[in-house]
From Swiss-Prot:
One of its GO terms (cellular component) is cytosolic large ribosomal subunit. This is Large ribosomal subunit protein uL6. PANTHER family: 60S/50S RIBOSOMAL PROTEIN L6/L9 (PTHR11655), LARGE RIBOSOMAL SUBUNIT PROTEIN UL6M (PTHR11655:SF14). Part of the 50S ribosomal subunit. GO terms for biological process: cytoplasmic translation. The keyword Transmembrane does not apply. InterPro entries: Ribosomal_uL6-like, Ribosomal_uL6-like_a/b-dom_sf, Ribosomal_uL6_a/b-dom, Ribosomal_uL6_bac-type, Ribosomal_uL6_CS. Keywords: Ribonucleoprotein, Ribosomal protein, RNA-binding, rRNA-binding. GO terms for molecular function: rRNA binding; structural constituent of ribosome. This protein binds to the 23S rRNA, and is important in its secondary structure. It is located near the subunit interface in the base of the L7/L12 stalk, and near the tRNA binding site of the peptidyltransferase center. It comes from Ralstonia pickettii (strain 12J). Coiled coil: none annotated. Belongs to the universal ribosomal protein uL6 family.
Amino acid sequence: MSRVGKAPIALPKGAEVNFAGGLLTVKGPLGTLTQPIHSLVKVNTDNGTITFAPADESREANALQGTMRALTANMVKGVTTGFERKLNLVGVGYRASVQGTALKLQLGFSHDVIHEMPEGVKAETPTQTEIIIKGSDKQKVGQVAAEVRGYRPPEPYKGKGVRYADERVILKETKKK
């Protein structure tokens, strides 16, 4: 059995869970998320906890039990507290600003990069060189952060580019004669 999958998920106040037709729906103050649950996993929702059990004793069912539990725990955390990812812009003239639902980036190209935010994800720019991406879906927040970083990843000689706030860029030495 999966050690991760055995642990029950405690529902915080303000969160509701509904399991019907193979779909697990979690509602909270920050929105609603839905996840299809694999047929090899059984779900029990009672007195403020969610537990998962494999439908049979196969290795696949045990693996899926842990996966479904982890995805559901992220959904519960997302609709109650939310997720955020911080990015920093390093480089002369690199700037970011929010225009409606889009993020406008000036990254040293001959044109501005406009990145449209998907539904459920918001961007903030406390300063011109900081971006905070927030949302209730952990996968979407991480995907948007990776896409924004992908426009100009940190280069290894000067470290210029878009980087995660907790990322350490290892700089190479230049070629010596």
